[in-house]
UniProtKB/Swiss-Prot annotation:
Native organism: Yersinia enterocolitica serotype O:8 / biotype 1B (strain NCTC 13174 / 8081)
Protein name: UPF0270 protein YE3952
Family: Belongs to the UPF0270 family.
HAMAP family: UPF0270 (MF_00690)
A Pfam cross-reference name: UPF0270
InterPro entries for the chain: UPF0270 (IPR010648), YehU-like_sf (IPR036685)
Gene3D superfamilies, A to Z: YehU-like
Length: 78
């Protein structure tokens, strides 16, 4: 189920974004980006609708994923 990011408390959203970025461990190539920059990148994706907050009833977890992956039914993958 998609959770509208606008309805999430700002501090909670900040914590979700930071936890997501730290968990992903994405390699940005030659130029390392700060945690704050990575968090803002993900925030922009949420605002633009490219990414969505998803609640998994199966796993009782919240995740951030590309909108297209959610539509493809990937929200219940481990």
């Amino acid at each position: 189920m998609i959770i509208p990011w606008q309805q999430v408390d700002s501090e909670t959203l900040d914590n979700l974004l930071e936890a997501f970025v730290l968990r992903e461990g994405t390699d940005y190539g030659e130029h390392e980006r700060s945690l704050e920059q990575k968090v803002e990148d993900v925030r922009r994706q949420l605002v633009s609708g490219e990414a969505v907050l998803v609640w998994s009833e199966l796993h009782e977890t919240i995740n951030i994923m590309p909108r297209g992956a959610f539509r493809a039914g990937a929200e219940e993958l481990p």
